[in-house]
């Protein structure tokens, strides 16, 4: 969450108080460098760890501990014990209302959970893990958003979450072939830490812009100041985004080379060792580059949240207990403020039909695009038998294509074809929907439709281009529909929608895999989701109407 670049709230707002030393120092080049460093440090985690290696590790470690679905006794990755009889093939009717053949039953692998109380498909284990991690991350993001936007906590929280996330990711070095619960828990904790870093990092942008020397020196013209702020904001934000992209691409190449080196070592036969090695390296990268932020960024005070209780007197008895109680009350007040901010955003958005339509469409798109990545990675490993090196190469191609999409779509394709933002957004949705549609084609054609590894390379380029394009166009379209002066609260809602949507897709895909033990069937769900977003944008959003409604709402609130 970020504050509005111009704070329109009055200083005598009852729930907020200004600290006495609210005067801010000028933004320096070193501070901008320090802010960009948070993206340089953390972006490889989301691209390499979450996007590539952790899904592979979780699937592999689940398979190493899994058993055959047909008897739930035979280990998946070990030869069958001759003393244990193999069950006879099932007769017709043994699996009523099931789409499974005997062959798919025999090949499928399931993981016993909590002492064998129930079983899940080994491919769905990673999806359930990420669904849970996003749920925890969303709760954390809402709870801490009040502290990230208020007071002097954002710097310490940014560094703290980054260091914690790096250390947790490095703990993958301790995971062995049996620790599938530990591997899953580390993914949940590290992804939650990344969410905290992202919130705190975003909250710095408006402060860096407001206190930039070229902005502070403008006193007479508000319009000129706003224009300069927009220019500086785009410049700083662009540098930060570029540093994250470059860092992620660089780290993806480094980890791929490490895996190549380890694979050629005849003394290493563990399938998860190279995966946990490169995951830990990304954690080390995150940890090392997070530390300089402590010295480069200034605390940047902002309005403190007022707590209607005085701090305890150190001279009175029971001070240690009272100070703990006081700090808990302060933490609770900040958490409550975060949820109040979210409800305020939802209440304001409910008055704007175009904002509501956008958020509904964005919920579907964000969920689908996120789930396509993890589903495709698991499909490539389990069905196409692609190696970790090949999947690393796909990650590199996706990253390069995403950069190209983010540049070419708004700067070349959109102006050349004279497309509006809504039309461009719909074009991207249709473009992305061809990915699961191509996977569905494999049900009917053996020569096409993701039956060969080379097809994954082509789809990686296709997917990356849509990913880079949608990231650029979505924010531009959404920003046009927001009432001026309420950017912070509405982008908070955008962020929560973005994060929260990623709970649904992986969970539903995991259920489909558990029911059918066929990842390809998940492409039907992803295709339907993406196509469902088209009418939401086509019929639900009128950009001119949205701008007018936002302006009217702004005037009503000012009045």
UniProtKB/Swiss-Prot annotation:
Q: Which gene encodes it?
A: ATG22
Similarity-based family = Belongs to the ATG22 family.
Its taxonomic path starts at: Eukaryota, Fungi, Dikarya, Ascomycota, Saccharomycotina
Q: What does this protein do?
A: Vacuolar effluxer which mediate the efflux of amino acids resulting from autophagic degradation. The release of autophagic amino acids allows the maintenance of protein synthesis and viability during nitrogen starvation.
Q: Which Pfam families match?
A: ATG22
- Example GO BP: autophagy
Which named protein is this?
A: Autophagy-related protein 22
Q: Which residues form a coiled coil?
A: none
UniProt membrane topology term: Multi-pass membrane protein
A GO CC annotation recorded here is: vacuolar membrane
InterPro entries named in the record: Atg22, Atg22-like, ATG22/LtaA_families, MFS_trans_sf
**Residues that carry a glycan:** 97, 106
* TM regions (residue ranges): 32-52, 126-146, 156-176, 181-201, 239-259, 277-297, 358-378, 393-413, 425-445, 453-473, 493-513, 523-543
| Localisation per UniProt entry | Vacuole membrane
Q: Answer whether the UniProt record assigns the keyword Transmembrane helix to this protein.
A: yes
